[in-house]
Amino acid sequence: MLTRRSVLAGAVAGLLAPSARGAGAEKPLRQSAATRGRFFGCAAGSYQLRDADFALALARDANILVPEYELKRLIVEPSPGKFDYSGADALLGFANAHGMKMRGHTLVWYAANPPWLDEKVLGAPDDEILTDYIERLMGRYRGRTHSWDVVNEAIHLDDGRADGLRDCIWLKRFGPSYVDLAYHTAKRADPGALLVYNDWGCEGGEAWNDKFRAATLKFLDAALARKVPIEALGLQGHLNAFGTGVDQRKLRTFLDQVRAMGLRILVTEHDVDDSGAPLDIAARDRAVADASARFLDVVLDNDATIAVLTWGLTDRYLKAPGGIRATLSGYMPRKLPLDTNLQRKPMWRAIARAFDGAR
């Protein structure tokens, strides 16, 4: 019978002597990253650890891990005052057993909240609905997490505010100062954890991306001027293989500006959407790898960048999109480094080359 102990032991063996299951003579990504003083990792769910082959692949390639859902408030506090840490604890145990760091994601977000939270926040007489949760969650993992996405996706230009902030329950209840409150609380709760602001939209080459980059710089600059302890920017890195793509010049300039603020940079949720693509797998895989390479070659050329995490390691757990095209063609997304059989794809090799060429 496969037990948790046997999975962990097997994964360690996989690290010491990589099997022929896709390992070959190529270095694991964690080794390529570590050679350049960086981390490589991915998001995972605790249920995936029951898949022994996946656990081997994860232990082989990753030296940093982030829970995909199991540190979001919807999962952690499904009803008021009732907390479930089981999934995050399992992932942390796996990370510790395999010499990995673990990230926390995410403390304050407009989404993935339990249904009861909106009413509680809007009617809260004080700030404890925000601060108590941060203190409890970060306190539980104090000294055991590399970094936290404290505030996630606070910017939303379509809401039309001069400061660019998203109109969400936290803004409605506390005003813009909810950002300050969250980071100051987080710094007190775990002074050793790197505090990250995480968002998407800074990567692309369209006109709205230009506006989003400008708004992000304005947001960060204003927060730092107020002595808000934001210490790093998380670039989610969700790309589209058949969209406009990355403008490398603009991205490089933006990252240089972030670095000049004294912030570190992490790629936190990288994947490459291949929907709307030709059905030919080889063509899709090439396009996904090319998009990833154009992005990571710039990001890893900046010495403020400390980590790259993909939003999952393998296509094995991805779901088919809806719609007639997917139904008739059998289309399945291929947006992550390993395929459904845990074999290395061109995207995996693009990531490896980006680390090998990193500054």
Task: Tell me what each language-model feature is.
Residues 65, 95, 148, 233, ...:
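Conserved, mostly hydrophobic/aromatic
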Residues 47-59, 130-134, 211-221, 292-295:
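Short, acidic/polar
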Residues 173-181, 190-194, 214-218, 222-278, ...:
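Glycoside hydrolase catalytic-domain groove-lining segments
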Residues 1-15:
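N-terminal secretory signal peptides and thylakoid transit peptides that target proteins
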Residues 32-35, 53-62, 89-101, 140-142, ...:
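Acidic (Asp/Glu)-rich catalytic clusters
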Residues 66-69, 76, 87-202, 274:
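Substrate-binding cleft and catalytic face of glycoside hydrolase catalytic domains
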Residues 19-43:
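C-terminal segment of N-terminal export signals and the immediately downstream linker at the start
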Residues 149, 153-159, 164-172, 250-257, ...:
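Aromatic-rich peripheral "rim/lid" segments of glycoside hydrolase catalytic domains that contact
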